[in-house]
Regions:
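Enriched for short, Lys/Arg-rich terminal
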Residues: 1-17, 25, 36, 51, ...
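Surface-exposed, Lys/Arg-rich phosphate-binding patches that contact polyanionic backbones
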Residues: 28-29
């Protein structure tokens, strides 16, 4: 009965999410426990291929919007087929500065 649940050859690929120390420091300093939980849940979804509400910002940088707290953002870039680098995080209020920072971090990563 359950032998035909998935077609033969079905394979689910997980994404690998790599975090910069800048991103880790930002996340660890968040005092909003509920917001932090939403961010971690969103990262887990991205590992399974569901990035949700995201926008390409140019220079290979994209933004994931988290609909919790003060409008958290995660800035990331794709570095391999299924590998993504979380560059930094921020809030809606500091969005423009965070975007510039993420693009700068992406340039530094590309140069290495």
């Amino acid at each position: 009965m359950f032998n035909t649940l998935y077609p033969y050859g079905y394979m689910h690929t997980m994404n690998t999410i790599v975090r910069t120390t800048i991103f880790d420091e930002w996340l660890s300093h968040l005092k909003d426990v509920n917001g932090k939980a939403h961010i971690i849940k969103r990262i887990r979804s991205a590992e399974r291929g569901n990035f949700g509400d995201r926008t390409a910002l140019g220079q290979r940088v994209s933004e994931m919007r988290i609909h919790a707290g003060p409008g958290y953002r995660i800035y990331f870039m794709r570095i391999e087929a299924t590998v993504y680098l979380l560059l930094c995080g921020g809030r809606k209020r500091g969005q423009q500065a965070d975007i510039l920072r993420a693009k700068q971090l992406a340039r530094i990563y590309k140069e290495e």
